[in-house]
Regions:
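Glycine-rich portal/gate segments that line the openings of hydrophobic small-molecule binding cavities
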Residues: 29-82, 141
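A generic beta-sheet turn/junction motif
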Residues: 11, 54, 99-101
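Beta-strand/loop substructures that line and gate deep hydrophobic ligand-binding cavities in soluble
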Residues: 80-130, 141
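Hydrophobic/aromatic beta-strand elements that line small-molecule binding cavities or substrate pockets
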Residues: 9, 59-65, 89-98
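Hydrophobic ligand-binding cavity/cleft-lining segments
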Residues: 1-44
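Short beta-strand segments
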Residues: 5-7, 57-61, 104
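Short amphipathic alpha-helical signal-transduction/dimerization elements
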Residues: 26, 129-140
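Hydrophobic pocket/interface hotspot
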Residues: 18-22, 49, 63, 75, ...
Length: 141
């Protein structure tokens, strides 16, 4: 059994500005993130990114897809301390232009493999909602 979660937001900024922040993969817009250490460059498939959160949680993300054409990136969490309570987690962030008003629609999806605890899924949901709100704040000001 797997669990799929989608969170999204329209951000009042052009796609190029939003994608520049997302594709940097430093999560600088997200107040829960203390630091990010990257290997092999941030936009290279196979590169890893050690994300340390303010609460002490450390997760290692591996980039499995990166597309400038589609303004999307996919990463999997390959390590987490403390453990997440799921067998695996894959996340995708994709940005779409909204041509009617030059804004950007951002969609952040997560797929949790079998045995995914509802606590882990719920936690990811609220963290993504908060991160999208903070991304909007970072680019709309």
């Amino acid at each position: 059994m797997s669990t799929h979660n989608i969170e999204s937001r329209v951000i009042k900024a052009p796609l190029a500005k939003v994608w520049a922040i997302i594709s940097a993969l430093d999560f600088a817009f997200w107040s829960l993130v203390k630091s990010v250490e990257s290997t092999s460059g941030s936009q290279i498939v196979g590169s890893t990114h050690t994300v340390t959160f303010n609460d002490g949680t450390t997760q290692v993300y591996r980039i499995v897809e990166f597309s400038e054409i589609n303004n999307s990136l996919t990463y999997e969490i390959i390590e987490s301390e403390p453990a997440m309570g799921v067998l695996s987690a894959t996340h995708r962030i994709r940005a779409y232009p909204v041509s009617a008003d030059n804004t950007t629609f951002v969609q952040w999806t997560s797929d949790f493999a079998a045995e995914g605890s509802q606590e882990a899924v719920g936690d990811a949901k609220y963290k993504k909602l908060e991160a999208l709100a903070e991304l909007a704040k970072a680019v709309e000001n």
